[in-house]
Amino acid sequence: MKSIHILNQPLYQTQEFFTPFALTDVLIEDSGQQEQPYLHFWQLSQGMILGMKDTRLPQLQAALATLPASGYTPVVRNSGGLGVVADAGILNVSLILPLTNQKLSTDEAYEKMYHLIQQAFPEVTITTGEVATSYCPGEFDLSIEGQKIAGIAQRRIKNGVAIMLYLSVNGDQQGRGVLVRNFYQAGLKESFGTQGYPPVDPTSMANLADFLPKMTPEEVIKRLSAVFPKAKHLDSRDWLNQLADTSRYESRLASMAQRNQIIKEQKNDSL
């Protein structure tokens, strides 16, 4: 396998929210075709990233109406799972691997991300296991001292896989939890915590910086990058600009726009 390429770029603003999701899909395809692994870091400015299940909330319009007052903009992602918060204190990390000459089970793929995080932060004990009262709970939630700091999902396209982690690094994690709890309470009313949606308890989650003081997203990027000393570093925008054929990327952007049409419709209905 080729040496890994590490991609990063400045914080995505609201008008660019579709970009990292479209880019991830293109990177997965490219990884499979070129047998090229990638490590992709990205952040959104004040977003709530929704799963498709979130768009089926009984009171979706009421749920979405809770977000603007807190300054967060919803975006529906192109992978499974439930809602997570994204802001300047949250780092999203995608480990993208070719599957052309190797097979990775779902659990094996999750383990690769878990081991990467362990390598980067050897001074703390990080455990896996679902934190049921966190937002977007899953079997491979990452926790320190019983509090969730990160969640992992994955997406497979043809001969590539993206193992995607969101890591709460610093900032107001309690406030993030309240934001998501309010979202589901508005969307479910008296059915809060049922129908496959989590009974979010903000105290079930914490920041990495709560255990490693002064930790920042920039420091996390340095630590994770140090695991790959021979990596080539690129700006994601430069990588996109050098694509000979941008039609795949444009197609993925269009798919994201279509997926998010439901958000636009709900907003229009509320006017």
Ranges and model annotations:
Residues 1-101:
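N-terminal lobe of the biotin/lipoate ligase/transferase fold
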Residues 124, 159-271:
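Long, positively charged amphipathic alpha-helical accessory segments at protein N-termini or as interdomain linkers
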Residues 74, 123-133, 231-235:
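Short, well-structured beta-strand/strand-turn elements
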Residues 91-132:
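Contiguous, small/hydrophobic- and glycine-enriched helical/loop subdomains that border
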Residues 128-149:
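Beta-rich nucleic-acid/ligand-interaction surfaces
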Residues 19, 23, 59, 105-113, ...:
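Short amphipathic alpha-helical segments
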Residues 62-66, 70, 116-124, 223-231:
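Generic non-transmembrane alpha-helical segments
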Residues 146-154, 162:
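Aromatic/basic-lined ligand-recognition segments
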